Amino acid sequence: MTMKKSECIQRIPEGGYVFRIYPPNNKSQSLGQSTKVYASEKECHDAFDCFIDLLAEHRTTDESFVKIKKHSTQGENGILTQWTFHFYDENGCEVFTRRMPYWAKANCSKGIASVVRYVKELK
């Protein structure tokens, strides 16, 4: 994957940062965007790195078969935000779903490991 971090991380007028993920060779279609506004560029880069590590394992030649959805639920301690990664096979059939807590670095690593294991078994 030849994705440059600088192409995906954008400063927004409010003073924070967001990032977008694009399929290879297609800057007009976004696979996912962080809806959290990061206070610092480093914070945004860290989240991007966590995310891209996961996506990098699941590329076909021209397209990704990963789709990302955001879920927010009201819990006892406030709003909990999670990302769900939906994996599809070449025919567009959903084969696996993985839900991960919002940008917790340790959880991201665990999620990457289990997702990589699963998708390797599919190939």
Question: What does each model-identified segment do?
Answer:
Residues 1-18, 33, 39-82, 117:
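Short N-terminal "domain-start" leader segments
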Residues 18-24, 30-36, 47, 82-90, ...:
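A structural feature that tracks compact, well-ordered secondary-structure segments
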Residues 108:
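Beta-rich carbohydrate-recognition and catalytic domains
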Residues 122-123:
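Short acidic DE-rich linear segments
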